């Protein structure tokens, strides 16, 4: 059962800033008793904070892995290790034997799929920034699945990893949540570390950098702060958009950026949007973000999603037929993280029920996801979202006007309808003013070409996909 908590720790460590993770999640203790998972907090403040903000996520993760509701109890332990004080009321106990089954299935799945980052043992003495790289060795180029959605980002990353400070400096990678930006970022660091073990490498989330600036300010230790950050060979900053409205942080990063670039040291940045569109960040920083190379990471296309699933199944030593992989890939389209979660659920259900993994079992395991997806995304919703985005009337989606101002958004909407729904080309054509299915096919081909060659179109589509799915 400890493996389940390791999975939770790994997921939260990936999604939260280091400060949030160390303050709220890492102090929790975990135990399992009679079909109930128990989390023990060190004090009432942490207990209430976790209950309000993270308990639902932990419960959802348990249900995602097991495809069955699991009781999560949040309690309080005192310093003398007495019986915990319960905050959350327990749900009805699982059926006899359920605890053993749950423990067995969590153990099997979490050992093979989505390995969590191991929790670090408390160091005997504090380490300086340059002694702690922050890298996760699990993120490497050899286990990163490449497709049209990320091939440019991967190629640029490899070039930078092999020639740091000379090619594409800075390298700016942008895209939505769960698309592999962090994987690419850390793969660069791990590659350089393997080639140059003595290199000073630092990976961190932008919020951690903000925290370091605050600490330096509080302790009047900016000389030490600058010495550590300005002496790096490779600086990897994740989610730079978190610098928004933090003027002192932006000022310090401006100095660090200039110092590293002048010394021909490599900087790599990830963000959820294009450099010029980052809100509430100083213009001089946004300009510098574009000095090197800017590349997008987009949602994976169907073939890439299938390849990701097959690779993860292989790593988990699970047999996954291509027809099952295609079925999963057609249902889960937004991110690699969601693909991973869907596969976890299917494997757990197969182990739990004793059935072989086939399309019918996959449908059962993902029935809630399929139902939600079916309710949320419709052609009408896509048409309205695209029309709003391009500031045209929805009626232009059905009209015969061929002006580029109307035709381009219409073609993009057709393409998104094909990607985000299960409708056929003829059905999509009918929804767009009774157009022939070949018109829809031509629109999809044309937009796909533009997507590969026009950065603005690629960015528009990535934004639209996120808006539609949210």
UniProtKB/Swiss-Prot annotation:
Tell me, what is one Gene Ontology molecular-function annotation carried by this entry? ATP hydrolysis activity
Example GO biological process: regulation of DNA replication
Q: Where is this region: Domain IV, binds dsDNA?
A: 351-470
Q: Which stretches of sequence are listed as region Domain III, AAA+ region?
A: 134-350
Give the span(s) annotated as Domain I, interacts with DnaA modulators: 1-68
The record's note on quaternary structure and interaction partners says: Oligomerizes as a right-handed, spiral filament on DNA at oriC.
The text the record gives for the protein's domains is:
Domain I is involved in oligomerization and binding regulators, domain II is flexibile and of varying length in different bacteria, domain III forms the AAA+ region, while domain IV binds dsDNA.
Q: What does this protein do?
A: Plays an essential role in the initiation and regulation of chromosomal replication. ATP-DnaA binds to the origin of replication (oriC) to initiate formation of the DNA replication initiation complex once per cell cycle. Binds the DnaA box (a 9 base pair repeat at the origin) and separates the double-stranded (ds)DNA. Forms a right-handed helical filament on oriC DNA; dsDNA binds to the exterior of the filament while single-stranded (ss)DNA is stabiized in the filament's interior.
Question: What name goes with this protein?
Answer: Chromosomal replication initiator protein DnaA
What organism, scientifically named, is this protein from? Answer: Methylobacillus flagellatus (strain ATCC 51484 / DSM 6875 / VKM B-1610 / KT)
